[in-house]
Amino acid sequence: MTREIVIGGVKIGAKRPLALVAGPCVIESELATMRQAERLMTICNALSLPLIFKASYDKANRTSIGAYRGPGMREGLRILRKVKESLGLAVLSDVHSIEQVAPAAEVLDVLQIPAFLCRQTDLLIAAAATGRVINVKKGQFLAPWDMKNVAAKIASSGNENIILTERGASFGYNNLVVDMRSFPVMRASGYPVIFDATHSVQLPGGQGESSGGQREFVEFLSRAAVAAGVDGIFMEVHEEPEKALCDGPNSIALNDLPALLATLKAIDAVVK
């Protein structure tokens, strides 16, 4: 059994019911972010599903130099603070450098370490020192059993509020695959495990100057992950994925979310 992590009013791990981390890939505007957060809250309240809202203020690892990155840290954190204070939702976003950690920790309930940065020791230790919950995405280049070393870096600072997220492994060029064995392997570390169902169907750089995606497989992979006993599901959602400024090809339309979440909740109830 994994330890229980408390994030605002949300409890993850230790056989707690499935939790959802969801929101747009990137903050596109204050109005759109608030609208989507409210919609997500309504959907999750109807299903009694715990929700943590996610959105990035800066996508620092976009495929091309001309791709939209977001509003920047200052404006992005202001918008996330508004989501948190207006709607009462816990909020999560990425930190990409040590300099971002302190200001981000003033607003965010969860500091997320991107997959490409999951072995950056100084960043992990700086994030851990804030005492915030740390969600680390497993690098596409790492074996699941290697994540125990990543978690140990964070725990060395006395912070064991750690969540590990599976987001697929590199499978040749421009492709990812999900190894379902990774869930029990990473949960054996004692920390809750989340499955990133939308980034796992990404085709990195698959469109030349942007990443492609196969959202039609999100439902199948997320059902399998919940059946395998994950503690939470991470999904990027959008009102109109075809118009999203980032990761549209692998984002889920908000209109399609209620039915999928109802199925996942039912599977989780059987497994747990």
Swiss-Prot record:
InterPro entries found in the cross-reference section: Aldolase_TIM, DAHP1/KDSA, KDO8P_synthase
Known pathway: Carbohydrate biosynthesis; 3-deoxy-D-manno-octulosonate biosynthesis; 3-deoxy-D-manno-octulosonate from D-ribulose 5-phosphate: step 2/3; Bacterial outer membrane biogenesis; lipopolysaccharide biosynthesis
GO cellular component: cytoplasm
Keywords assigned: Cytoplasm, Lipopolysaccharide biosynthesis, Transferase
EC number: 2.5.1.55
Annotated GO biological process: keto-3-deoxy-D-manno-octulosonic acid biosynthetic process
The UniProt record lists the keyword Disulfide bond: no
HAMAP family assigned: KDO8P_synth (MF_00056)
Similarity comment: family membership: Belongs to the KdsA family.
Name under which the protein is recorded: 2-dehydro-3-deoxyphosphooctonate aldolase
Lineage of the species this protein comes from: Bacteria, Pseudomonadati, Thermodesulfobacteriota, Desulfuromonadia, Desulfuromonadales
